[in-house]
């Protein structure tokens, strides 16, 4: 093959031709999944190597784009990159220009487990630290992005369930490298919650990928939530999404809307509770009134019993009863019935022949007089062991 039949290029022309072929023959945008190695910032630009274990390529995020990224990778992180090819003809250098970059799910879950283990060891994740939520909150702070559909749903739910509660909406970024901003907001709320009259806070983010919730796996954000002076409720992502922030919160709700349902009593249940308590209060009042009336009746009876005329009548009745008893037991009653009483001369009753002696003077009492007598003989009954005189 003769050299005259082949295309002839200068180095510059060759590199330019290669650049044209790449620009025309390759996709203007593409997605690449890779592992990051040797990331470093030079003059505001992020340079890194993307590899998959078999091949590697240089990538760059220009300073203007780097400021817009929600995620800056560390060495060993898995990433999903949206990019395009950059070819520098002067030195025939090829690189992927990063247009967007997000962590892979593997990276997110690895960070989740790392931070979870760290906070478990520190005692920050501890169910025994969880505090009771207010039953009827007066004022709540809602930390979420503004505007957002999640916030709209939360406001609507709060209005439907318990319009008496006031919501203080605190805008925060909820995605990307925004942990310092969230920590700053939490610090300010912790310092001013008394003045603001807050009862609890809600930190929420609407649905998205698990990768979008990575900021809520940040260790410092989670420490701030765990030590916040008021109860904390999280409503982050979807029901299946679990972040470290959910583990340190006093209550984890599946969604932002569910967070409001958790904190806000429903008007219907509150009305039912009020009705039940009113009924119990009425029953209690009736019972107390009956008890008071019963005590009053008892005291009236006691007062009646202590009146002088009542006391006098009671004593009169007792005296009459005793008189009747005395009359019933009086010897005169037996004398009136024909019996006689035998006494010694000094008036001692004689009940047995052993109480007298022969020739002893006796008194025989009858109903209408006394007979003086002398004991001439003393004769015992056949069954008696008493003495007998001749």
UniProtKB/Swiss-Prot annotation:
Name of the protein: Exodeoxyribonuclease 7 large subunit
Give a yes or no for keyword Hydrolase in this entry. Answer: yes
| Species for this entry | Synechococcus sp. (strain CC9311)
Q: Where in the cell is it found?
A: Cytoplasm
Q: Which reaction does it catalyse?
A: Exonucleolytic cleavage in either 5'- to 3'- or 3'- to 5'-direction to yield nucleoside 5'-phosphates
What CDD domains does the annotation carry? ExoVII_LU_OBF
EC number(s) recorded for this UniProt protein: 3.1.11.6
What is one process in the GO biological process aspect for this record? Answer: DNA catabolic process
Top EC group: hydrolase
Tell me, in a sentence or two, what this protein's role is.
Bidirectionally degrades single-stranded DNA into large acid-insoluble oligonucleotides, which are then degraded further into small acid-soluble oligonucleotides.
Q: How does it assemble?
A: Heterooligomer composed of large and small subunits.
